[in-house]
From Swiss-Prot:
InterPro entries: EHV_Unk. It comes from Varicella-zoster virus (strain Dumas). The gene is 64. Phosphorylated. It is found in: Virion tegument; Host nucleus matrix. Belongs to the herpesviridae US10 family. One of its GO terms (molecular function) is zinc ion binding. Transmembrane segments: none annotated. This is Virion protein US10 homolog. Induction: Expressed late in the infection cycle.
Amino acid sequence: MNLCGSRGEHPGGEYAGLYCTRHDTPAHQALMNDAERYFAAALCAISTEAYEAFIHSPSERPCASLWGRAKDAFGRMCGELAADRQRPPSVPPIRRAVLSLLREQCMPDPQSHLELSERLILMAYWCCLGHAGLPTIGLSPDNKCIRAELYDRPGGICHRLFDAYLGCGSLGVPRTYERS
């Protein structure tokens, strides 16, 4: 499953979509709580390092320590979120589905750079489902995650995982799409 789109579809070269989580921005991270912000920064650094390793030696498997660091950062974030008494205890169904998919697919070390890249984007999507649509200073509650285009587009993660455009926008008001 290629969550960033298939090779050759991205402007800037045939592998421009690989490790797309390396393009995260401080503006996006500012929308997150502390635990999510730490995770997003770690994921961006891991993705950048993995992409540089891929460019240098594309035929080699990704370094297992990169996946280990990503799992550790994700586990730390989940632990901090679980310990935060101010957050609601329930997890929306779509977030539970993504977490279940993460658990199912992410047990062994990734065998390729594409596989590692896909796992990192899945982790990023789970994270964005947590802050998208939440009110932040100066933004309305229906404000979408500013990285929503990564997930909610034809061929994006929502379409590939759920065969639907679920996005990571507003929590509570489902988006509607016209059928052609």
